[in-house]
């Protein structure tokens, strides 16, 4: 079973997994178009969140934020470089939202991507629990986000998550999707953005930037205190980045206003 699309039509996943067909059109198998990208998002999310959770659970007191910041950033850059050509390398519902808004992901794939990322988050967190000593796991609350302890911290944490995720989503959308600015260093830039964000924002909000990263450990450790912050903040940032690129900083093909005549 396969479908046919015009050569100029954007792909949902890997734009290289195509075969020439009759009349100058491309034939893409349903598996490569719909299923494979979702499997890759699940796999990449699981690997990234496993490494991230383990780095928090096994973090020593002498390393502070440096160990989780480097582990998250390097792991994300690695999985993007390895798997990004298949799915776009989002591994984050907020990034998928921003990518969809600027034309980097078809709308019909947004929900499947989200489901895949959340399942990957649960799998990665469960694997981190499986390989960790029980005492360390519970001392770290299963790598769930526990930075916000009281109502007075909520506003600062929410604003921090919006700003931190904006930087990350900009790194993805401008570095890997926008035609005028994308380049081969995108995986490095995206991973570096995560590292910088955690180092800077960790004491304020935990530096999540990713609902799947928050959701997986929350399920496994059953820790839901102030969990909504790590959904609302990143998703608002995804909307903001989509608006910025569509209206102001995107290339001529992406921008909806202020086009040259």
Curated annotation (Swiss-Prot):
Membrane spanning stretches: 37-57, 85-105, 108-128, 157-177, 184-204, 229-249
**In this record, what's one Pfam family?**
MIP
Topology in the lipid bilayer = Multi-pass membrane protein
Q: What is the effect of changing residue 213 to A?
A: Does not affect hydrogen peroxide transport activity under stress condition
Q: Where in the sequence is Cysteine persulfide found?
A: 53
Impact of changing residue 229 to M on the protein? In a breast cancer sample; somatic mutation
**Molecular function terms in GO for this entry?**
ammonium channel activity; methylammonium channel activity; urea channel activity; water channel activity
Instruction: Give the consequence of mutating residue 8 to S.
Output: Does not affect loss of hydrogen peroxide transport after stress
Q: Which domain of life is it from?
A: Eukaryota
Motif span (NPA 2)?
Answer: 210-212
GO BP of this protein: ammonium import across plasma membrane; ammonium transmembrane transport; B cell differentiation; cellular detoxification; cellular response to cAMP; hydrogen peroxide transmembrane transport; methylammonium transport; regulation of cholesterol biosynthetic process
Q: State the InterPro entries in the record.
A: Aquaporin-like, Aquaporin_8, Aquaporin_transptr, MIP, MIP_CS
Describe regulators of its activity. Reversibly gated by a two-step sulfenylation-persulfidation process in cells undergoing diverse stresses.
Residues carrying a glycan: 59, 139
Q: Tell me the protein's name.
A: Aquaporin-8
| Organism for this UniProt entry | Homo sapiens
Q: Taxonomic classification, please?
A: Eukaryota, Metazoa, Chordata, Craniata, Vertebrata
């Amino acid at each position: 079973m396969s479908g046919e699309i015009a050569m100029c039509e954007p792909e949902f996943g890997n734009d290289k997994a195509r075969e020439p067909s009759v009349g100058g059109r491309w034939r893409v198998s349903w598996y490569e178009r719909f299923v494979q990208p979702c499997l890759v998002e699940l796999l990449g999310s699981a690997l990234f969140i496993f490494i991230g959770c383990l780095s928090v659970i096994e973090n020593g007191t002498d390393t502070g934020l440096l160990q989780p910041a480097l582990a998250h950033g390097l792991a994300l850059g690695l999985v993007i470089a390895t798997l990004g050509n298949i799915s776009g390398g989002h591994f984050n519902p907020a990034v998928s939202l921003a990518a969809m808004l600027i034309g980097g992901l078809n709308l019909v794939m947004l929900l499947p991507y989200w489901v895949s990322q959340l399942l990957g988050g649960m799998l990665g967190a469960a694997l981190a629990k499986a390989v960790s000593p029980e005492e360390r796991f519970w001392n770290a609350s299963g790598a769930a986000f526990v930075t916000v302890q009281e109502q007075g911290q909520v506003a600062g944490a929410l604003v921090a998550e919006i700003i931190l995720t904006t930087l990350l989503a900009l790194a993805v959308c401008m570095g890997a999707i926008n035609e005028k600015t994308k380049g081969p260093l995108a995986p490095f830039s995206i991973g570096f953005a995560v590292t910088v964000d955690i180092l800077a924002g960790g004491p304020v909000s935990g530096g999540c930037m990713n609902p799947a990263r928050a959701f997986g450990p929350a399920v496994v450790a059953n820790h839901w205190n102030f969990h909504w912050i790590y959904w609302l903040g990143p998703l608002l940032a995804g909307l903001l980045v989509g608006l910025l690129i569509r209206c102001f900083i995107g290339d001529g093909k992406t921008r909806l206003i202020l086009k040259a005549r």
